């Protein structure tokens, strides 16, 4: 079954072709980062308009890469949420228009399920069950995964997501959008031990996260250095390192607890922040001590992309799930409300 995957949840237009037998055939991505950088963040209206301009040309580009025609497509998967509603509607509308014209099934899939399943595109995919850390600009969640659509929420952020905290810290330090990679790059120049930031909610039981207090602590540290006239580039790097270390340590501590509580030996990390080198190294060291394994997608599939949507959609479309005539766009959508892949669905995955 040849599936076209479409991702338009935020500021990246992603398209991919996935074959159920041969795997990923082609993928392409257009990033709007340059357009939004002048505004210090994503402008929803501009994002939607750019998706309109770029989506169909990207579809044709991917088909050409794979040597396929539109008539070869046997199903279409698109991101139905969570995300910016206007951006989601662009992807959903194009997917359903193509599906209607070609007479093939269409399904709106969950953006974070796509991230969660992205490591399945690698040569050594994880087996079920596993614990997943979903960590991005909008989400920080720990989930027990027993199968596709079989999700138990173990913990999540009660306020800011880790990726959001990275972006806000970048602004405090005068760095450009997107903040996460720039904070990480600056942290590489930092000196160990110059600052010690708190590891929020690690001094109590449970698997929930909170990063708003850490964000405030960072702001106070930056302002204190400004007041003293010491906020030079080296001090900024020291602060970036202390902040990154605090986030990474917090995530590692919670992941260890989740593995110990569930008895799972496999940990999947997914989402944009999963590309962070310090986080990967720290989680691998922790898992090795527990005689476990860590799985993640290649860096290009950590951020938003069409390949993960094509893969996630393929698993559900093969099982007979589809939207029918309903275009689905859900800005907020808890992942643990998704139905199992074996449950019959002819009117979308959202009740």
From Swiss-Prot:
- What Enzyme Commission number(s) does the record list for this chain? 2.3.1.234
UniProt GO cellular component terms: cytoplasm
Cell compartment(s), UniProt: Cytoplasm
Q: Which reaction does it catalyse?
A: L-threonylcarbamoyladenylate + adenosine(37) in tRNA = N(6)-L-threonylcarbamoyladenosine(37) in tRNA + AMP + H(+)
Q: Which keywords appear in this protein's UniProt record, sorted alphabetically?
A: Acyltransferase, Cytoplasm, Iron, Metal-binding, Transferase, tRNA processing
Single Gene Ontology MF annotation: iron ion binding
**Does the record's keyword annotation contain Acyltransferase?**
yes
A Gene Ontology biological process term: tRNA threonylcarbamoyladenosine modification
The residues the record assigns to binding substrate are 134-138, 167, 180, 276
Name of the top EC class for this enzyme: transferase
Gene3D superfamilies listed in its UniProt record: 3.30.420.40
Query: Which of this chain's residues are annotated to bind Fe cation?
Result: 111, 115, 304
The answer to whether UniProt assigns keyword Acyltransferase to this entry is yes
The cofactor note from the UniProt entry for this protein is:
Binds 1 Fe(2+) ion per subunit.
Q: Which InterPro entries match?
A: ATPase_NBD, Gcp-like_dom, KAE1/TsaD, TsaD
- HAMAP family according to UniProt: TsaD (MF_01445)
What is the designated name of this protein?
Answer: tRNA N6-adenosine threonylcarbamoyltransferase
What organism is recorded for this protein? Marinobacter nauticus (strain ATCC 700491 / DSM 11845 / VT8) (Marinobacter aquaeolei)
């Amino acid at each position: 079954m040849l599936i076209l995957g479409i991702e338009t949840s935020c500021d990246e237009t992603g398209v991919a072709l996935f074959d159920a037998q041969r795997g990923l055939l082609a993928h392409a991505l257009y990033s709007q980062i340059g357009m939004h950088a002048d505004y210090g963040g994503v402008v929803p209206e501009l994002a939607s308009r750019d998706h309109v301009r770029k989506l169909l040309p990207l579809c044709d580009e991917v088909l050409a890469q794979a040597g396929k025609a539109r008539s070869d497509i046997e199903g279409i998967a698109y991101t139905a949420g969570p995300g910016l509603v206007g951006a989601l509607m662009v992807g959903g509308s194009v997917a359903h228009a193509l599906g209607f014209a070609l007479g093939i099934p269409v399904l709106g899939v969950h953006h974070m399920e796509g991230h969660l399943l992205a490591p399945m595109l690698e040569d050594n995919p994880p087996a079920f069950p596993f614990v997943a850390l979903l960590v991005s600009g909008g989400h920080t969640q720990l989930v027990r995964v027993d199968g596709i659509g079989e999700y138990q929420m173990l913990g999540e952020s009660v306020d800011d997501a880790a990726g959001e905290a990275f972006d806000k810290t970048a602004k405090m330090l005068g760095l450009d959008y997107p903040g996460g990679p720039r904070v990480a790059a600056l942290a590489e120049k930092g000196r160990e031990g110059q600052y010690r930031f708190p590891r929020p909610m690690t001094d109590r039981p449970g698997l929930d996260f909170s990063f708003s207090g850490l964000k405030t602590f960072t702001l106070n540290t930056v302002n204190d250095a400004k007041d003293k006239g010491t906020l030079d580039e080296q001090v900024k790097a020291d602060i970036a390192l202390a902040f990154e270390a605090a986030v990474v340590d917090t995530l590692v501590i919670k992941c260890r607890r989740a593995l110990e509580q569930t008895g799972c030996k496999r940990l999947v990390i997914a989402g944009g922040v999963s590309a962070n080198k310090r986080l990967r190294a720290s989680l691998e060291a922790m898992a090795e001590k527990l005689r476990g394994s860590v799985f993640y997608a290649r860096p290009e599939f950590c951020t938003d992309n069409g390949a993960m949507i094509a893969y996630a959609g393929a698993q559900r479309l093969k099982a007979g799930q589809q939207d029918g005539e309903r275009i689905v766009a859900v800005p907020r959508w808890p992942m643990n409300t998704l139905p199992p892949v074996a449950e019959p669905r002819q009117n979308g995955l959202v009740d």
